[in-house]
């Protein structure tokens, strides 16, 4: 399998921009590109899919605490592609705590045996770039930097200085650069990049970006590097796929709700269940289904439109009152509350839970955690350890009883504990995002609620 991993020295270096440009340039050459993203991010994967036409897959060694399973998923998705391109997260060695192998990009590179291309920010730097590359190349004896791409380069002369320094003081080849160009900048807001669903003229941006990469990066050399990764010897755990043939699962999918891991959706399909997308923004009612799944997204951006769609509120409430299982994550929790408040405005939501979501100006929760149900819930049985992550600016103010204890640990130490998660009847909602492949029995438990 041909494969490369695009990493960086830190967040904000332009890793995503360079990755998207490479994906576009490779696709323009006629190659089938399979995209991957290290970590739990949903927005970057949507960009990947927009460019390649192929669903991007998250590789997260915290959410899936099984190296063999991660490697098997990587192999499965990449086997039919001409090249697999993995976008890293944060800095190459950044993860959970100070262990360079704990939930980091470098760990995924080693787990998948993928050559690393390091993106270095060229803004206001020249010879010092060589020190960065040399330090990263020496830091982990089990990992070698196979090439470097310089981002935000001011001129050809500027690039020559950086390239000359790196190749004089290190043995890492410089594959090229991306010049400074405001036309390819990706807009950001409170949860990172603005989702593709809310942007216009993306095709033009991708064309410009891909052409810049094709002009200034040695893609032939990059493709040669992609062939140097060792072959994976995969021994995945045996997977018992439950049979839910005939089951209908309605899941919210539109500009307001689109945070889903592709592997989660694929596994639901593998059970024989039928996935039926619906739009809380556009449609009047939930499709006829046995189970309702409302993922995360940006309900706050579309609060007015969501509030006006009263018939959808009534349809979801009716499903809840009939005892149909409803599972909601983050933005889904906000939607199932009684209202959403921001900027002195209040917007009526579905009202399954008596609670108000309030937008704030800072991150309220950020990062990985372990959830433990305090009683049997739709998400899991009492005492089950459930891996997940939270990332939100809102708070949910409610008198509803919490159903989970959540713990954040770092380097073996507990750094934070809190409670969350709400269940009423067969409806469960929390800020937690989860990956089913941590424990595939979760689906059997959740779908089993239809019969309970």
From Swiss-Prot:
- Which InterPro entries does the annotation name? CbiA/CobB_synth, Class_I_gatase-like, CobQ/CobB/MinD/ParA_Nub-bd_dom, GATase_3, P-loop_NTPase
Pathway(s) the chain acts in: Cofactor biosynthesis; adenosylcobalamin biosynthesis; cob(II)yrinate a,c-diamide from sirohydrochlorin (anaerobic route): step 10/10
Task: Give the annotated active site.
Answer: 330
What UniProt notes about the protein's domains is: Comprises of two domains. The C-terminal domain contains the binding site for glutamine and catalyzes the hydrolysis of this substrate to glutamate and ammonia. The N-terminal domain is anticipated to bind ATP and cobyrinate and catalyzes the ultimate synthesis of the diamide product. The ammonia produced via the glutaminase domain is probably translocated to the adjacent domain via a molecular tunnel, where it reacts with an activated intermediate.
Family annotation (NCBIfam families): cobB, PRK01077.1
Task: Return the similarity comment.
Answer: Belongs to the CobB/CbiA family.
What name appears for this protein in its UniProt entry?
Cobyrinate a,c-diamide synthase
